[in-house]
């Protein structure tokens, strides 16, 4: 089953320090552009509330080489950095990271792997990243939606965030994957939206963002 978007704005739990709230509120234009949609934040608010209370929370990351951290130090991939940021933001060392990124794999392979590599870990929050590994064909679209459906409706009812990356040549499956996110009311992050203005103006070059085309 899908869930529609809600209108109330996203807010951090009251238990978070004022300093952390101020830091969150000082997002750059680039960071604001990256948020394609806040979606339905109820599950995310619940997870963040547990983090703020110091509870044990499992955050899983499923995707391709960008998630795995191909060509970068293991502490430099976004899964590692995001988990560390959450630990710092919520002053909670009980946040566990499960990095299920695997280079060169699409959402079709992700669907085959998701039970063992993600759902068996009982995640509370799942990030999905397959925008540059999937194809823009009907099979890939169906597999991606099946993967999202499987995770959203899994036993732990995790919060799910979709991440849309982009290749140096502009290739991305963001548009068709975003339609799935809209149908399920999911928060969505767009790397392309974050980077494009700076890339077009020359303020950034691709090597500032990535060591390879992805």
Label every model-predicted segment.
Residues 52-55, 76, 80-100, 105, ...:
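Alpha-helical cap/lid subdomain in secreted, periplasmic
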Residues 60-63, 163:
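Short hydrophobic segments within beta-strands
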Residues 65-68, 132-134:
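A short, flexible beta-alpha/helix-coil linker loop
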Residues 1-60, 67-74, 87-93, 200-203, ...:
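N-terminal secretory targeting modules
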């Amino acid at each position: 089953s899908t869930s529609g978007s809600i209108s109330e704005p996203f807010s951090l739990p009251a238990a978070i320090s004022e300093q952390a709230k101020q830091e969150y509120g000082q997002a750059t234009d680039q960071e604001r552009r990256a948020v394609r949609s806040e979606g339905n934040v109820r599950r995310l608010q619940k997870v963040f509330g547990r983090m703020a209370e110091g509870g044990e929370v499992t955050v899983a990351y499923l995707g391709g080489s960008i998630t795995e951290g191909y060509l970068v130090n293991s502490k430099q991939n976004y899964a590692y950095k995001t988990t560390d940021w959450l630990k710092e933001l919520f002053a909670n060392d009980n946040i566990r990271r499960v990095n299920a990124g695997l280079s060169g794999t699409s959402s079709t392979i992700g669907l085959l792997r998701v039970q063992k590599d993600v759902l068996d870990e009982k995640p509370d929050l799942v990030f999905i990243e397959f925008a540059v590994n999937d194809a823009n064909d009907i099979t890939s679209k169906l597999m991606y939606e099946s993967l999202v459906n499987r995770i959203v409706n899994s036993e732990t009812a995790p919060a799910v965030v979709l991440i849309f990356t982009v290749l140096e040549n502009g290739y991305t499956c963001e548009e068709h994957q975003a339609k799935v996110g809209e149908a399920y009311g999911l928060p969505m992050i767009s790397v392309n939206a974050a980077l494009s203005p700076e890339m077009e103006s020359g303020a950034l070059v691709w090597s500032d963002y990535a060591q390879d085309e992805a």
